[in-house]
Amino acid sequence: MTLSDEDKITIEKFALQNAVKYGKAPQLGAVMGKVMGLCPHLRPLSKEVGPVIQHVLDEVMKEVPEEWQARLEVIAPELIEELNTKKEPDKGLKPLDVKEGESVVMRFAPNPNGPPTLGSTRGIVVNSEYVKRYGGKFIIRFDDTDPQTKRPMLEAYDWYLEDCEWLDAKPDEVVIASDNMEVYYDYARQLLEMGHAYVCFCEGGDFKKFKDAKEPCPHRGHAPEVNLEHWDKMLAGEYEEKAAVVRIKTDIEHKDPAMRDFGAFRIVKTAHPRPEVDDKYVVWPLLDFEGAIEDHVLGMTHIIRGKDLMDSEKRQGYIYNYLGWEYPKTTHWGRVKMHEFGKFSTSGLRQSIEDGEYSGWDDPRLPTLRALRRRGIKPEAIRKFMIDMGVGETDVSLSMDTLYAENRKIIDTIANRYFFVWDPVELEVEDAVCCTVNPSLHPSEDRGVRCIDIGSKLLVCKSDVESAELGDMLRMKYLYNIEITSVSPLKCKCIGDSMEDAKSNKMRIIHWVPEDGIPVKVLAPQGEFIGMGEKQIVDELDNVVQFERFGFCRIDSVDDGVVAYFTHK
């Protein structure tokens, strides 16, 4: 038993449906699974079906996405309809616990030691979206009270606000923690006076021994007036770094060592990078203390934080109980890992930039919003990507392909099409007739044509012709059919312009650029692509275009040749 023509059409349908659905090359396993699931008579022929499917996939990949869609509409319009009507799984944000008529106050609190990354973007988008839905106030609070270990960058304050506005998440209020040091000092003094805090002079290793043994350190029992005296000396700069720490009294026998008398203030004599602050303060709050005070002072109603910060909530609970405050409603979410970037930290990226490994914070290899924006990723796509992810404690592992799919829905209808030939080689067309061709700027949107003047020589991708042999026939897209007449030097002759002939002879379709094209350099996460492109590309500065058979790119500059940033396939 062999495969019938009907079986082969069925395979092509499912291959095209997979390609259209995901906007990229169809996967052999996925197509095989669907074919075997819906065509039981083919199951005994799996060894024969596999190569046929692979051949179909190879043919599909010779075409561009617009041609996939057009072909599928012809041979299986019902599969197009199925893609459009298939119910999406439940996505998005769950309702907040909000009383009727209550407005919400929510915040995103970054350390401005670098620009926003994909990791921090989730907090910006989700918190701002909840405020949009329920009404209230969205606050950006810069937790910049660590001038030494996670030292803030002055530029990052503005970068965060710029990126928030770009993401349609402009804050209603901006708070800078280092402006509020006197507020933290005031509450520290109150806790010292109440006997709920003390100044500890133990060296780190010594305090750990007491903590691990569930025993109080010698300073825990000091009277409030003694602690206040030490506190004033700390503020006056009379103690050296690491000589004294303010600790919050908790349960010294708590089963979790992290809960036992945690640190609230430490001495840091490194000047703050903000000129308004500089060396004005030498006693700095740790994040658990600063965040606890700010969340109350700002009237926070709901907090969304990583599940890795559950201990912070418990520690802050002691401060809230001592001061008679009610803790905001809190939701936790799991970590998000993007396959393409693995584990990264802002401080690590900063060091790599300083070491010259990356060109800057907008290097296309980085997971920063500045890099994604420069590549042509749209803010609407990022918002939808983050909102669809929802809020849950389960760790999430995702591919950038998911974000790219959302972005493709936005840019596909607005991106004009052009040819870009990377690693170009010259192809001489014998007896060529000079002419002008006018391909559409967009396959489905009526927005005009490109004007390409053709001479006797074309530039093509080396990979398209490096294995060419005498007599090979190729279709030059939008132009004519050719036959290779010489491989060194590379020459061909025109054998007509019939698309039907190209199909019947199963010619590969390749793209090209006239010999007087313009230099183009594409910067991509995987490296640089150097080549030539159509002259009209210079009119697309700051726009996202599609280089046919290559992918979407944002045109970054056109001053000395074209420099483009790769968006995605």
From Swiss-Prot:
InterPro entries: Gln/Glu-tRNA_Ligase, Glu-tRNA-synth_arc/euk, Glu/Gln-tRNA-synth, Glu/Gln-tRNA-synth_Ib_cat-dom, Glu/Gln-tRNA-synth_Ib_codon-bd, Rbsml_bL25/Gln-tRNA_synth_N, Ribosomal_bL25/Gln-tRNA_synth, Rossmann-like_a/b/a_fold
Record's subcellular location: Cytoplasm
Main location: cytoplasm
UniProt GO MF annotations: ATP binding; glutamate-tRNA ligase activity
Enzyme class of the recorded protein, top EC level: ligase
Keyword Cytoplasm applies: yes
Claim: ATP-binding is one of the keywords in the record: yes
EC number: 6.1.1.17
Record key words, sorted: Aminoacyl-tRNA synthetase, ATP-binding, Cytoplasm, Ligase, Nucleotide-binding, Protein biosynthesis
Renumbered ranges of motif 'HIGH' region: 110-120
GO cellular component terms listed in the entry, alphabetical order: cytosol
Catalytic reaction equation(s): tRNA(Glu) + L-glutamate + ATP = L-glutamyl-tRNA(Glu) + AMP + diphosphate
One GO term (biological process): amide biosynthetic process
Top-level taxonomic group: Archaea
Physiological role: Catalyzes the attachment of glutamate to tRNA(Glu) in a two-step reaction: glutamate is first activated by ATP to form Glu-AMP and then transferred to the acceptor end of tRNA(Glu).
Family: Belongs to the class-I aminoacyl-tRNA synthetase family. Glutamate--tRNA ligase type 2 subfamily.
The name this protein goes by in its record: Glutamate--tRNA ligase
Annotated organism of origin: Methanococcoides burtonii (strain DSM 6242 / NBRC 107633 / OCM 468 / ACE-M)
